């Protein structure tokens, strides 16, 4: 007797799965997105459950029928002879997918199917199966599409990628069946049969190495677990199942060489060994803590297969280029005669390898579309895009510009006791980056390219930028931090992009300031406001100084070092704590200064304090949930300035600044106050190329305008 089946898989593996299933005896009737339909006898079904390395679920199709309405779904499920699938004493769960005009909720759909099953058994013998949503013995799938309901029984009860050996995983785990697909695309079974070795230099929790060992040693993945739902199937033949399990165990064979996994993280290596032990392949593999640049082959021939980091968070992709360049160099230099298969979602990182791929395959790591690049490592596969490769004509122009800027600005910065400054700001339009120096680090902020620029050109320029900057500026590649700068809205202005807690201390005049180059779009210090901060460093002792929207209060540090008494207001607790750290770093007594966590607009409305100098530097736009209202600086600057002026002593000064490039000051403010545009006086040497970086105004009461 043959049974109808649907075997699901990860997106992109359909035809690879078809080949595997045919080899296991399935008569394939249709290949569809994310799965294969076919017919099989009971022995073939058991072999599919034991041997498939690519499948997610193996579903026995029970029935299908027209079911546009709730009553029709219930009737179909009531009429089916469920006793041919399981008995009433089993626990069940329903997974429902799809919708119709009447059934728009999957929970509702599952309820209808469950009710139909329960009603059938009650009518049959007065008893009913219980529901267990966590770990049912019988899992039923119901799919409703185009008013056709298809119902099937999950023969295994869980996704087959859950082999059972991986109790814990690393930060970016690779599904076991996707790892198997990588190995099959790289022709690992054929290479293993020829005695090839294998090395994963980014092994993490060991999935690729373990799957490779299971393939090479002919270990059926289904042997690792004995909790398949098929044991509760009414037509299950336990003697046949045990016979096929025994035959699978007899096919296991030893390996001529150990397969190797290495990783720079020692903790994850311990986890990899534990996973290998649970998979029963620990004697076949070797896991070591080793950085990439120390990796060397243990055999003359082999396969390097890996899933290196490919940076899906903001700024990470380009930051990983040096790692991929190192991988390409290591492969080319040390692994001649080997094959390689490398998975990445980024074409930029693939190009950074500098090696030509023989073939590319599309795979999906979860929802993420990736490419598997298969390479032959030989002398004929020349290494390109290395950090020391010859520069293109355009890249040479960039090098010359950076070198010129460096020679000029380094002397100026040293003379003024400045260790952080902007050295480049899209001086050459085709290289649309801003580059800021922080001690011996360089932060590259990539402006989002316009849609008119082809992707491959933008990628080429990114690689050239990373090739040129270390040479021209004398910066170690590992000290390049790359972010993408774009027009920011609301909370994006201080968007967190990671968590490293890596802080760096920089110098600006007499002040020492803390910056974080990794975790946020901004570093904690707005370089374009340097001259304003240095102006506050000249305040008279005892000056009452208010810093509204204070951020990390770097301006207040300068004022406090001059002897001013500062009040610092910001909505962010994170930045206020950072501000306090800045004060402590400079040995400033915190008891003489205030750090207030408030919505600045609301605080200015209610406070009765008076100040001699106020620095008002709000974001261009903010819609933080903690604010009482949306802040739009073009719309709201009049009310903000009026509130700030109310807090000034009669002879006080307000400095209002904004980075909104198209900002226009409301003319009526000039009628009410003495307003002076001091923007040119606040643009330092490193921002002369971009004089519209901000607008700054000095505002006083009219009768003090001449003072």
Curated annotation (Swiss-Prot):
> Known SMART domains for this protein?
THUMP (SM00981)
- Read off the Gene3D superfamilies from this record: 3.30.2130.30, RNA methyltransferase domain (HRMD) like (3.30.750.80), Vaccinia Virus protein VP39 (3.40.50.150)
Q: What is the lineage of its organism?
A: Bacteria, Pseudomonadati, Pseudomonadota, Gammaproteobacteria, Legionellales
The signal peptide stretch is none
Role description: Specifically methylates the guanine in position 2445 (m2G2445) and the guanine in position 2069 (m7G2069) of 23S rRNA.
Q: Which domain of life is it from?
A: Bacteria
Provide the catalytic activity annotation.
guanosine(2445) in 23S rRNA + S-adenosyl-L-methionine = N(2)-methylguanosine(2445) in 23S rRNA + S-adenosyl-L-homocysteine + H(+); guanosine(2069) in 23S rRNA + S-adenosyl-L-methionine = N(2)-methylguanosine(2069) in 23S rRNA + S-adenosyl-L-homocysteine + H(+)
Keyword terms: Cytoplasm, Methyltransferase, RNA-binding, rRNA processing, S-adenosyl-L-methionine, Transferase
Annotated protein name in UniProt:
Ribosomal RNA large subunit methyltransferase K/L
Ranges for the THUMP domain?
Answer: 44-155
E.C. designation(s): 2.1.1.173, 2.1.1.264
GO CC terms: cytoplasm
């Amino acid at each position: 007797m043959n049974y109808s089946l649907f075997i699901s898989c990860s997106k992109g593996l359909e035809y690879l799965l078809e080949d595997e299933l045919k080899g296991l005896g399935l008569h394939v009737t249709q290949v569809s997105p994310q799965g294969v339909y076919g017919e099989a006898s009971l022995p073939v079904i058991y072999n599919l459950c034991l041997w498939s390395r690519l499948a997610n679920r193996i579903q026995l199709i029970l029935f299908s029928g027209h079911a546009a309405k709730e009553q029709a779904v219930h009737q179909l499920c009531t009429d089916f002879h469920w006793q041919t699938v399981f008995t009433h004493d089993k626990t069940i769960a329903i997974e429902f997918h799809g919708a119709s005009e009447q059934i728009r909720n999957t929970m509702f759909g599952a309820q209808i199917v469950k009710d139909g099953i329960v009603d059938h058994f009650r009518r049959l013998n007065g008893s009913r199966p219980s529901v267990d949503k966590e770990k049912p013995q019988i899992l039923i799938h119901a799919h409703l599409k185009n008013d056709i309901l298809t119902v099937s029984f999950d023969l295994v009860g869980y996704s087959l990628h859950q082999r059972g050996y991986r109790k814990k995983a690393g930060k970016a785990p690779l599904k076991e069946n996707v790892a198997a697909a990588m190995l099959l695309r790289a022709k690992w079974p054929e290479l293993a049969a020829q005695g090839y070795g294998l090395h994963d230099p980014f092994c993490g929790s060991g999935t690729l190495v373990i799957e490779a060992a299971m393939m090479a040693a002919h270990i059926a993945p289904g042997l690792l677990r004995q909790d398949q739902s098929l044991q509760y199937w009414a037509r299950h033949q336990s003697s046949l199942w045990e016979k096929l399990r025994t035959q699978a165990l007899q096919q296991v064979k030893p390996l001529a060489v150990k397969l190797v996994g290495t990783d720079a993280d020692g903790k994850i290596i311990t986890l990899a060994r534990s996973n290998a032990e649970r998979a029963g392949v620990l004697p076949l593999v070797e896991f070591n803590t080793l950085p990439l640049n120390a990796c060397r082959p243990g055999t003359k021939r082999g396969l390097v297969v890996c899933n290196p980091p490919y940076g899906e968070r903001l700024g990470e992709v380009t930051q990983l280029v040096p790692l991929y360049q190192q991988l390409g160099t290591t492969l080319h230099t040390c692994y001649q005669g080997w094959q390689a298969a490398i998975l990445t979602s980024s074409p930029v990182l693939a190009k950074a390898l500098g090696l030509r791929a023989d073939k590319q395959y599309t795979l999906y790591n979860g929802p993420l579309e990736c490419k598997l690049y298969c390479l032959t490592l030989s002398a004929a596969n020349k290494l390109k895009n290395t950090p020391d490769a010859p520069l293109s004509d355009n890249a040479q122009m960039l090098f010359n510009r950076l070198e010129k800027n460096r020679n000029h600005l380094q002397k100026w910065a040293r003379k003024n006791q400045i260790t952080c400054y902007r050295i480049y700001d899209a001086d050459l339009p085709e290289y649309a980056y801003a580059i800021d120096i922080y001690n011996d680090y360089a932060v590259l902020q990539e402006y989002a390219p316009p849609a008119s620029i082809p992707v491959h050109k933008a990628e080429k320029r990114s690689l050239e930028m990373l090739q040129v900057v270390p040479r021209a500026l004398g910066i170690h590649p590992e000290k390049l931090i790359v972010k993408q700068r774009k027009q920011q809205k609301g909370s994006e202005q201080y968007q967190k992009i990671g968590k490293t807690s890596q802080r760096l201390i920089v110098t600006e005049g007499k002040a020492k300031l803390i910056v974080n180059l990794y975790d946020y779009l901004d570093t904690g210090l707005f370089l374009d406001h340097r001259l304003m901060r240095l102006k506050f460093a000249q305040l008279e002792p005892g000056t009452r100084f208010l810093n509204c929207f204070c951020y990390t209060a770097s301006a207040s540090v300068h004022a406090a070092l001059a002897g001013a008494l500062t009040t610092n207001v910001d909505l962010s607790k994170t930045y206020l704590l950072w501000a306090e750290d800045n004060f402590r770093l400079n040995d400033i007594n915190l008891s003489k200064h205030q750090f207030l966590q408030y919505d600045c607009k609301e605080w200015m409305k209610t406070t009765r304090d008076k100040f001699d100098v106020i620095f008002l530097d709000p974001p261009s736009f903010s819609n933080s949930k903690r604010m009482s209202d949306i802040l739009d600086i073009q719309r709201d600057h009049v009310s903000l300035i009026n509130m700030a002026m109310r807090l000034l002593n009669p002879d006080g000064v307000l400095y209002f600044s904004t980075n909104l490039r198209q900002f226009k000051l409301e003319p009526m403010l000039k009628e009410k106050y003495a307003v002076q545009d001091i923007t040119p006086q606040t643009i330092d040497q490193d921002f002369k190329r971009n004089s519209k970086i901000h607008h700054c105004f000095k505002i006083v009461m009219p009768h003090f305008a001449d003072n």
